[in-house]
């Protein structure tokens, strides 16, 4: 089993949901933040970090049940800023980093294991694994330690920029189902994924 670090991005504002923390959206009675970690923890990560931003105070108690937390004090700068903060916080001797998004309710252990299986098959040949479905890039993504160091070496660069600039180092994998590209941005997405807002 390779050493895997896992980074969960949960800093967004959820503006198109009326300003609601996506990590608290409920699926089958469980918050999305918890659902992710309950699945991802089965990979037995050597390090687990949740990046918070908007709604940090509401999400932190939940996140701390599964991971360390770090806060992006300027989440309005966008996802790439949260990624860099998370990358810089890594302290373990990991081989691979899996970066997940809190608003992907269809991501389960099956999808995560599929990514890691591909990563192991091409060990040493590429520096990143990106799932795709019908030509659309998805998440989570997997980076090697070398890729993480390369992202951090360029100020203000996020993972997306590095992936775009280094296609020869990236394996884009066509996946058989939509789980990797489904996320939650609008009320329509909420209905599609059968999610609800907690009133607690």
Regions from the language model: what does each represent?
Residues 27, 70-72, 131, 173, ...:
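Hydrophobic residues at beta-strand termini and immediately following loops
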Residues 76-145, 149:
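Conserved beta-loop-beta/alpha segment of the NTase-like Rossmann-fold superfamily
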Residues 8, 21, 33, 86, ...:
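Residue-level signal for inorganic ion chemistry
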Residues 33-96, 110:
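Conserved N-terminal catalytic core of the sugar/cofactor nucleotidyltransferase
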Residues 17, 59-63, 115, 151, ...:
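Hydrophobic packing residues within well-ordered alpha-helices of enzyme cores
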Residues 2, 6, 149, 154-200:
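Conserved alpha/beta core of the MobA/IspD/sugar-nucleotide pyrophosphorylase nucleotidyltransferase superfamily
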Residues 19-22, 27-31, 50, 54, ...:
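Residues at secondary-structure transition points
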Residues 2-53:
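N-terminal glycine-rich phosphate-binding loop and ensuing alpha1 helix
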């Amino acid at each position: 089993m390779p050493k895997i670090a896992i980074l969960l991005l949960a800093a967004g504002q959820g503006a198109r949901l009326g300003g609601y923390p996506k990590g608290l959206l409920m699926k089958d009675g469980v918050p999305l933040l918890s659902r992710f970690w309950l699945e991802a923890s089965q990979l037995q990560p050597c390090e687990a970090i949740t990046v918070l931003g908007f709604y940090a105070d509401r999400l932190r108690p939940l996140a701390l049940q599964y991971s360390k937390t770090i806060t992006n004090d300027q989440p309005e700068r966008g996802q790439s800023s949260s990624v860099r903060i998370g990358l810089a916080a890594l302290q373990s001797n990991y081989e691979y980093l899996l970066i997940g998004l809190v608003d992907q309710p269809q991501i389960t252990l099956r999808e995560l294991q599929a990514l890691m299986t591909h990563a192991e098959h091409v060990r040493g040949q590429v520096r990143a694994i990106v799932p795709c479905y019908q030509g659309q890039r998805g998440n989570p993504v997997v980076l090697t330690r070398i890729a993480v160091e390369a992202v951090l070496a360029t100020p203000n660069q996020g993972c997306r920029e590095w992936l775009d600039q280094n296609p020869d180092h990236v394996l884009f994998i066509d996946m058989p189902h939509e789980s990797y590209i489904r996320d939650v941005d609008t009320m329509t997405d909420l209905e599609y994924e059968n999610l609800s807002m907690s009133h607690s």
